[in-house]
Amino acid sequence: MVSPSIEVLNSIADGKKYITSKELKKHNNPNDLWISILGKVYNVTEWAKEHPGGDAPLINLAGQDVTDAFIAFHPGTAWKHLDKLFTGYHLKDYQVSDISRDYRKLASEFAKAGMFEKKGHGVIYSLCFVSLLLSACVYGVLYSGSFWIHMLSGAILGLAWMQIAYLGHDAGHYQMMATRGWNKFAGIFIGNCITGISIAWWKWTHNAHHIACNSLDYDPDLQHLPMLAVSSKLFNSITSVFYGRQLTFDPLARFFVSYQHYLYYPIMCVARVNLYLQTILLLISKRKIPDRGLNILGTLIFWTWFPLLVSRLPNWPERVAFVLVSFCVTGIQHIQFTLNHFSGDVYVGPPKGDNWFEKQTRGTIDIACSSWMDWFFGGLQFQLEHHLFPRLPRCHLRSISPICRELCKKYNLPYVSLSFYDANVTTLKTLRTAALQARDLTNPAPQNLAWEAFNTHG
C-alpha cells in the first residue's frame, strides 16, 4: 500500500493529520483504495470486497471525495460503520460547492420528513396486481383452447414481468419489506424465480450505472455493441471498464449500427434474451456474488415453471408466438429504460465525485405523464429524481419533481422532461445521427468487401 508522501500535512493548530486531494488520488486502485466523505479519509480496500453494492462503485470513485454519492445511496445507519475504516487523515483542501450544499440540504430535509421510510401502499397494490395478472395468464393457457386467448395470455405475462421488474427495482434500491431478510427474499423471488433475471446481476450492473451515469466506458447501460451505439465516440473501440474488455467496433458492428434506428424496436422486442444470457454468465462466473446459491436456485425455478407453462400450449407455432408476444410486451419496458438515457449527454472517462449532481442532470431524461400512468412507468418516468435520490420510494418522486426542477433552474442545469412520444422521437434521432456517422467509411474501422457491398446501396 502506498504510504502518505511528503504531501501529508500536519496541523499544529488542531492536532489533526491532513492529506491533499492530490495525495488522495494516488490511492485509486483495487489494491489501494481510499475515499473521502465529508473531508474524512477512509481506507476501503478490503471493505470493497464486502460492500453490499458491489466493488464497482468504490473502484470507479476511488481516490476522490464521494460525499454526495454516499448520501444518495446510504441510509443514516451506514454512517456508524465508517469509523472502523477511518485512516486518521482529513482532506486539507476539502471544499463543498454551492450545488452540493443545496443537494445535501434537500436530502437531509427528506430524511427528517421520514420520506425514505414512508413507502405507502404501492408495494401491496403492485403485488396484488401482479398476482392477478399471473393468475389470468396461467388460466388462459391451461383452460382455453383459443389461439387468441393464448396470445392475450402471453401479453398479460409480459405486462406482469414489467410490473415485477419495477418491484425488483424497488427491492434493489431500498428496503420495501419489513426486514432486510424479507427484502432479500422478495428480490430473489420476484427477480430470479418469476422473471428469470438475477437480482445479483441487476445490482451489479445497476449500481455501476448509477455511479457512472452515461459514461461510455464505465456505464454498462450504454455498452451495447455490436448492435447499438449512442455516440460516435464508441467507434474508437473503447475499453469497457465495467466488463474489462474492448467494445470492438468492427465491420459487423458498423453494419448493425448503420441501421440501428430501424433495428431499435425489433431489438427491444427480444432484448430480454440478452438479460437471460447475462444472468447465466454471471452466475457461472468466478466473480464473487452475494447469495450465489439462492440466485442459482431462483433462476432454476424460473426455467422450470416457464417452459412447463409454454409446453401446455397445443403446438409449436403457438408456443413460439406466445413467447414472442410476452417478450414484445415487456420490450416496452426496455424502450422506457433507454429513453431515459440514450439521448442524454455522454462522456468518456471515470465518474467524478465532485460533480455528482451535474452528471445526473445531464445524463437523464424524464418522461412527462399524468399521475394515473405512474403504475405503467413504475416511477422511473422521474428518472432524474430517482438518480438524485435512489433510495426514495417511488410514491414520493412526483412530489419532489418541482423541487428538483427549481434546483436545476437555480444552477442553470438541464431538466429535460419529454412526452413518451417525443422521447421516442429524440431517441431515434440520436440513433440515426450515430448511424449516419457509422456509414462514413472515412471513420477508422476494419473494413471488408462485404461491408462495402452493403453500403453501396445506402
UniProtKB/Swiss-Prot annotation:
Subcellular localization, as worded in the UniProt entry: Membrane
CDD domains: Delta6-FADS-like
Binding of heme, residues: H51, H74
PROSITE patterns recorded: CYTOCHROME_B5_2
A GO term from the CC aspect: membrane
Pfam families named among the record's database cross-references: Cyt-b5 (PF00173), FA_desaturase (PF00487)
Keyword vocabulary terms for this entry: Electron transport, Heme, Iron, Lipid metabolism, Membrane, Metal-binding, Oxidoreductase, Sphingolipid metabolism, Transmembrane, Transmembrane helix, Transport
Top-level EC class: oxidoreductase
EC number: 1.14.19.29
Membrane-spanning parts: 122-142, 147-167, 185-205, 264-284, 293-313, 320-340
Keyword Transmembrane helix among UniProt keywords: yes
Membrane topology term: Multi-pass membrane protein
Cofactors that this protein relies on: Fe cation
GO biological process, one term: sphingolipid metabolic process
GO molecular function: metal ion binding; sphingolipid 8-(E/Z)-desaturase activity
Residue ranges of the motif Histidine box-3: 383-387
Main localization of the protein described in the UniProt heading: membrane
Reaction(s) catalysed (UniProt annotation): an N-acyl-(4R)-4-hydroxysphinganine + 2 Fe(II)-[cytochrome b5] + O2 + 2 H(+) = a (4R,8E)-4-hydroxysphingenine ceramide + 2 Fe(III)-[cytochrome b5] + 2 H2O; an N-acyl-(4R)-4-hydroxysphinganine + 2 Fe(II)-[cytochrome b5] + O2 + 2 H(+) = a (4R,8Z)-4-hydroxysphing-8-enine ceramide + 2 Fe(III)-[cytochrome b5] + 2 H2O
Motif (Histidine box-2): 206-210
Role according to the record: Plays a major role as delta(8)-fatty-acid desaturase which introduces a double bond at the 8-position in the long-chain base (LCB) of ceramides with or without a hydroxy group at the 4-position. The enzyme produces both the 8E and 8Z isomers. This structural modification contributes to the quantitative partitioning of ceramides between the two major sphingolipid classes, glucosylceramides and glycosylinositolphosphoryl ceramides. Sphingolipids are important membrane components involved in environmental stress responses, such as resistance to chilling, and act as cell signaling molecules.
Similarity comment: Belongs to the fatty acid desaturase type 1 family.
Domain remark text: The histidine box domains may contain the active site and/or be involved in metal ion binding.
Protein name in the entry: Delta(8)-fatty-acid desaturase
Provenance organism: Helianthus annuus
